[in-house]
Structure formats: structure tokens, C-alpha cells
Amino acid sequence: MKHYSIQPANLEFNAEGTPVSRDFDDVYFSNDNGLEETRYVFLGGNQLEVRFPEHPHPLFVVAESGFGTGLNFLTLWQAFDQFREAHPQAQLQRLHFISFEKFPLTRADLALAHQHWPELAPWAEQLQAQWPMPLPGCHRLLLDEGRVTLDLWFGDINELTSQQDDSLNQKVDAWFLDGFAPAKNPDMWTQNLFNAMARLARPGGTLATFTSAGFVRRGLQDAGFTMQKRKGFGRKREMLCGVMEQTLPLPCSAPWFNRTGSSKREAAIIGGGIACALLSLALLRRGWQVTLYCADEAPALGASGNRQGALYPLLSKHDEALNRFFSNAFTFARRFYDQLPVKFDHDWCGVTQLGWDEKSQHKIAQMLSMDLPAELAVAVEANAVEQITGVATNCSGITYPQGGWLCPAELTRNVLELAQQQGLQIYYQYQLQNLSRKDDCWLLNFAGDQQATHSVVVLANGHQISRFSQTSTLPVYSVAGQVSHIPTTPELAELKQVLCYDGYLTPQNPANQHHCIGASYHRGSEDTAYSEDDQQQNRQRLIDCFPQAQWAKEVDVSDKEARCGVRCATRDHLPMVGNVPDYEATLVEYASLAEQKDEAVSAPVFDDLFMFAALGSRGLCSAPLCAEILAAQMSDEPIPMDASTLAALNPNRLWVRKLLKGKAVKAG
């Protein structure tokens, strides 16, 4: 059985107040002066004080083995802030730190360890505030308004580096080879790790480590680094430094899922919902010039226009990619929304998913068997449901304590307003009819004979994504649904959490004293007309799931208040994020893929054409991380996702899976 919880660090604090690992019998940092040692070994060993002002790119990438207390990261962040203050006009604008940690500290232990360095408190407090729950995989933290990105990879570094997507190859400018001493933790210091470090290092990239062990020096040399010894810190005689002076040949493990970015920094986004809003912010943060074309007269008039939407992860015992993506997407979304400098109605009141029949009870039992962190999800017995939700249901279930609800329409509008303040250009009532390549750009033809030319285009227009020749064969489908808006009652006013059953019910929004109840489901439909049948069906599903609950019977839908929208979905319930695949070229190039994997070319795609679609009913959960993934891909930056999970988001995945098995592929 796959477990989705990471074991925390087993440590104690010695007489000097230094954290010590019980498992490895080693200190996390020097009792003498850990801060100065970090500055000497890692910042000095990689010559960062000299390299920062001379760096020719806007982003500097550092990777580290063993995050521990975060001392190396915090020290580097402090130094980077000092550099930016002293060199405001420098080419280098942002710092990206990637670290691997098998046994992460708890938030409490992290805060206790940070008390050692009062001068780092301004940075340490920001790290503590966003410290992620112990889930495997990558946790992206956006710090200092996005100027500093921290990717925390929880798990074994030798496993995680082998699971990296090829897009991370040759991205690392400097390596901090840290961790417990080789004699204490020999499982980490392997040739596989040294080879991975070399593969990920940019030509000209450097490394530094506190150890001078001969097998470490020889292993790094064998991997491709040019190594030298340097005087060690304090009483330590020697340490090691290295540089990648050659350009190593790069492996391509799965070319059919290869992702390509763009050297250009100008893009048009087509759409008007939450995907467009969040992607605009992510691209603007990376220095892109962004223009948005919305077919409607205002934003959030499509699937993103609801008054209340639930935020919680989609989990399944039988789908590892689904679990890995949605658990990390959910935790990223909470961190993202919490630091977003815009106002929107929301309440992180928790979400409880109830087992209202035998099938749903079995599904919940399977989810609970996955050893999930209690911060993510916990079981709740029937007699406790009323206490935590405020209403009686006579059902047990699973509760997501960090879930809740938010107003998607308000979020989308206000994020777009923020993006406009940062340079986003928006054109409303621009209905894209078709697009074509012209002189290494995309020519966009809109209704009313309007035209525009852009270097890069992102299609993020929901269920209308397949209306163009380049996307007409995508395996996506429309789902029309109606959400009912119901006035509160004395009993409903007691509801403290979002309830999920064969539908969902939100607590009242204090702004309007209404609840949302929904939603109907009509696959293949794009009908947005009000339906009295759907209105009654939303009420009846609630009653059918909780037949003994008097409060459910008193739900009133007679005022016909509702909102109808159309979602875009996929068969496997995962979004489609990445390059727009070329269907015809894919069939030609991969006609013999099942027999000739070793000869496969890179995935056929349309140059500089991307898509962000098929968010289904979990867009509030998935959109923030998907926006970050796509913006990173487009900008040729590290992507916060392992290769196999990232492949599960690739727009060509459903075709390629069949082709890998030698099966026929049909359009749509």
C-alpha cells in the first residue's frame, strides 16, 4: 500500500540548544557557529558574493541536499536580499532554492531551532508561516512576494533526483552538498547522487561541501565535476569545491512527454476565468508581457463565476498520480490564497466528505487507509460529525480541516485587477475565431474582423478549448451544471463546514446570508439556461442522502435563485497543462511507438502554443499549482512536480498511453 505521509525528524536539543538527530547521532549545525560556517562553506565555496552581480540571467538556481533546519537557505536568502538592495539594477532579480529532505522537522521544532539566529528572524518567520505538511513530493513556497522560490522535496534524495522531469536538467547554478556526515548517513552519499548533481548542474555551475572525504571527491570527479580542496571552516582542515566545466550529454527518459518552453517573454492568454487570472500573475512575476483576451464583457462569467466553491483535494487509493497531484495542489493553493494581496469572500472552515451510502463509505475507508497526515485529512465518526459541522447527518466520513470555501468570481475579478496593476492588458468582448502561424508568431483572428499578433499564446478558455483546428481532437468534454442559491434558516445557519455527499452544501456567506447547493451534472451539454428540474434535483439529493435530517427537508429552492455554468473535464479527472500537442504529427511520429521506444522523437507540439484547461470541478484546488507549473515551463524554469505526475497532466497523455500499448487512437 502506498503511504502519503512523511516521517518527521526524530531529534532532541542538546545542552547548547543545538538540534541533534537521534537517528543519525549528528548535529544539524555546528555548536560553535553554524551561521558563519554556512556563509564560509556554501556561500563562499560557491563564490556567490562575486557571482550574483555578474549573473547574466534574471534567475539564480541553488540546489541542496538536506534542508534540515533551513539554515543554509535562510542565510542565502539574507545574502540575496542584501545583494538586491546593493544592486537594484542588476540582471539577477529572483532566487530559486531547491532542497531535498527525507525527515522534515515539525513546525514547532523548526521554530525552536531558528531561535539560535535572531538576525535571521525576518526570513525565518516567513518560512515558518508557510512550512508545509509532511506529504511526499514537491512543496513550492513563494516568498518575498515571489522574488524567492523555495522548492522543498520531501523524501529520499536518491529516489527524488531520479524522478525529476528532464526539464530540470542543467538548471542548477550552485549545489550545496550538505547533510549529516558521510560516516553517519552513508545511504545519502552515493554515486547515484553525484551523477544526478552533475546532470542537473548548468555548465559552469559550482558545488561546495563541508566534507573532504576522498570517496566524495572521487565520486564527484567521476560524475563530471572538476574538484579542488579548500581550507575548511574553523577547526576543520579542508572542504571541497567543484565546478562543472563540461557540457554533459543529456538523457531523455520519456521523449513522448517532453515539455518545451519559449525563449520569448510575450504572450496572449485566451479566456476570462481563474486559470487566466492566476497564470497572468505567475507570468508577470517572471517578467513576461501579458495580454488577456476575454470573449465576455467582464471576467468570471463562465465556470469561475460561482458565489461559493469548495476547496479540498481529490483523493483515490487506486490512482497515485491523482493523489500526488491533488494533495500537493491543495496545500499549495492554501499557501497561495493565504498570501494573495487581494480580498475575496472565503472561510477556511473545513470540509467534511460524508459516507451517505455503502459505496461512498467504502471509498472513504480506502482514502483513510493511505496513512494521510492528520493536517490533510482525518476520519470522523457519525457522532462527531454534528459537533464539527453543526448539523446532524447520521453519517461518518473524512474531514479536511484546512479546506473550506471561497468566492471564485470575486477571486478572479480581484486577481485580474491586481495583474492589471502589474502590467496586464485586458481586452473584453474579443471572441477568438481561429489562430494560425505567421512569421514565427501567432496571428489571432477575432469576431468582428479584429486581429492581433503575439509571440506566444495560451488557450485557457474552459470548455471552448476545442473550438480551434489545433485543439479540436483533444479528449476533453463539457459538463453543464446548475448551482442553487438558497436562503439560510435557523438550522442551516448552524452549518460550520462545507458538506460533501452526492452533492455539496456550503455554510452561509455572511455577505448575503445564502448557501450554495449543487451541482447538477450533464455530461456533453453546454446549456446554461435555468432548469427547474435541476433546482429540485439539487434539493432532493440532499434529502435522499440525509433522510432523517429535518433541516434538509426545510431547504427552500422556490425563489429559483441559481447559476448555470459549463466545466471542461477529462476522463481521468486531471487537468491538461502544457504544450498543445499536434494530433496528426503525434499519430505519424508515434505510429510504431510500442515497438520503437528507443527511437522516439520529442513529443510533436505546436510551437509557442500552450493550454491550461480541463480543471473540472476542482479548479479552485488545482488552478494555483497548474498556473505555477505552466509559467515555469514556459519560462524554462524548474517545475514543482515529479516526472510521472507531470506526465499525468500532459495534454497528449491519453493518446500516448494508447500508442505505448500499440492501440489505436481516436480523436476526441
Swiss-Prot record:
GO MF annotations for this entry? flavin adenine dinucleotide binding; oxidoreductase activity, acting on the CH-NH group of donors; tRNA (5-methylaminomethyl-2-thiouridylate)(34)-methyltransferase activity
Gene Ontology biological-process annotations: methylation; tRNA wobble uridine modification
According to UniProt, the reaction catalysed is: 5-aminomethyl-2-thiouridine(34) in tRNA + S-adenosyl-L-methionine = 5-methylaminomethyl-2-thiouridine(34) in tRNA + S-adenosyl-L-homocysteine + H(+)
Q: Which NCBIfam families match?
A: MnmC_Cterm, PRK01747.1-1, PRK01747.1-2, PRK01747.1-3, PRK01747.1-5, tRNA_MNMC2
Role played = Catalyzes the last two steps in the biosynthesis of 5-methylaminomethyl-2-thiouridine (mnm(5)s(2)U) at the wobble position (U34) in tRNA. Catalyzes the FAD-dependent demodification of cmnm(5)s(2)U34 to nm(5)s(2)U34, followed by the transfer of a methyl group from S-adenosyl-L-methionine to nm(5)s(2)U34, to form mnm(5)s(2)U34.
Q: Which SUPFAM superfamilies match?
A: FAD/NAD(P)-binding domain
Q: Required cofactors, per record?
A: FAD
Presence of keyword Ligase? no
Q: What is the protein name for this chain?
A: tRNA 5-methylaminomethyl-2-thiouridine biosynthesis bifunctional protein MnmC
Q: Where is this region: tRNA (mnm(5)s(2)U34)-methyltransferase?
A: 1-245
Q: What is its main location?
A: cytoplasm
Q: Where is this region: FAD-dependent cmnm(5)s(2)U34 oxidoreductase?
A: 270-668
**Cellular component, GO, one term:** cytoplasm
Q: Which family does it belong to?
A: In the N-terminal section; belongs to the methyltransferase superfamily. tRNA (mnm(5)s(2)U34)-methyltransferase family. In the C-terminal section; belongs to the DAO family.
* Database matches in Gene3D superfamilies: D-Amino Acid Oxidase, subunit A, domain 2, FAD/NAD(P)-binding domain, Vaccinia Virus protein VP39
| Species whose genome carries this gene | Shigella boydii serotype 4 (strain Sb227)
Task: Please verify whether the record's keywords include Lyase.
Answer: no
Q: Sorted alphabetically, which keywords does the UniProt record give?
A: Cytoplasm, FAD, Flavoprotein, Methyltransferase, Multifunctional enzyme, Oxidoreductase, S-adenosyl-L-methionine, Transferase, tRNA processing
Please state the Enzyme Commission number of this protein. Answer: 2.1.1.61, 1.5.-.-
Q: Where found, per UniProt?
A: Cytoplasm
